[in-house]
């Protein structure tokens, strides 16, 4: 084995890497333990879908709970492997199942990152693993959620490491599993293309200035295999187009004002204040950029591929869709590890003799403190607000009845607590808009308080008996509905009201 982390000619102690990974997992999981309720509305959906799979099997042709969504007509699970991994504890109480799902994702991501560092023989890899704890609040919030995006990040890091070391067989297997774990797994293909093309710019020697076909073929072949063994083939290919192209396009172009008004924060850019709070995540990419610009000999296939990819995701996450930021931050950390590897291999003088370890340790500690103090200062994302409302409807709603959710995201907790009911759309409002743009416009008209008779519209056009309203978010709609004949508020707490419009 070639020289690895620690010093040239010496393999770093594995236990340091394992201990660093365990420390980071404990750090993140300890934060979730302090706030064990769901941190994201999507957690209700994923845990509910896994529980449903235990009864109906892995293949579902229709998501019958949301008749106004395109998934009602054609359903494909975008993350079947993720949901299979949730099956063993899907029937446990929500809080317990959510904690176990979060822990599983944290172990995978941290383990994948540590494995990637080991694969590429990064110097002192435990430092980079510890730095995962200080990448800012956006990345930390993602780590605290039982959602498949955590697995997207872990698989992406593994793909990058296997490309760097040209382990084609392992890359094929990882890409196939990646395709089953997340609908966005196709990003392995452009990553492989970039790796092939980066040799034209790299300073790896004349023999490396070529464009090999193996990485692209292997990545594409592995991804395609995953799609072909998908339980929902061929509908998964339709889902692939909608998830990766239609939804991001609609989110970034504001082509429809009604749809744009309902998009979640993850599909919008972060504000300047929030972006500035992520300063720990910018340390690694800034160092990578400085090193590659000032030291041409450090521009290898590895550093260019991972460095440029991380910068692209960070830029997109900062300016367009914040979800990309969470992927760019750990990739930038891996890019910094690769730059450090090149630095060691070329025996370049230390940039800060005698100060490197102290500065690295200080930056890691400050990043961790800033990240977790920031989480406490902002408070956790309040995804537990609909618990009482959804549980009440689970007890009082009759099978086949329909719920009009003022906030479309409430379909997810209703799916978990009241699976006998139907609602509007789960996960993304674009699925509602694509099925019936006019009806979607009517929905937006109702919840914005512009419809003069919302009760009639809800009864006649949506066929719903129940209406769920967060009163602080929709005061005008609530005021109009309160004056509707026959409307009764049967449940209320500080977060939600449930209004009964009467049986049809």
Residue ranges and their predicted role:
Residues 38-42, 54-57, 183-296:
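Transmembrane catalytic cores of multi-pass membrane glycosyltransferases
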Residues 68-96:
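Short hydrophobic/aromatic helix or loop-helix immediately within or flanking a transmembrane segment
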Residues 100-122:
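Transmembrane-helix motifs of polytopic, lipid-linked glycan transferases
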Residues 130, 162-178, 209-218, 304-311:
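Short hydrophobic alpha-helices at membrane interfaces in multi-pass membrane enzymes
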Residues 136-140, 157-162, 169-184, 188-192, ...:
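Membrane-interface alpha helices of multi-pass inner-membrane proteins
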Residues 156-170, 203, 288-298:
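Membrane-interface transmembrane helices that cradle and orient dolichyl/undecaprenyl
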Residues 219-224, 334, 338-373:
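Signature aromatic-anchored transmembrane alpha helix within multi-pass, membrane-resident enzymes
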Residues 397-437, 460, 464-474, 499:
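Short periplasmic/luminal acceptor-recognition loop of GT-C membrane glycosyltransferases, typified by
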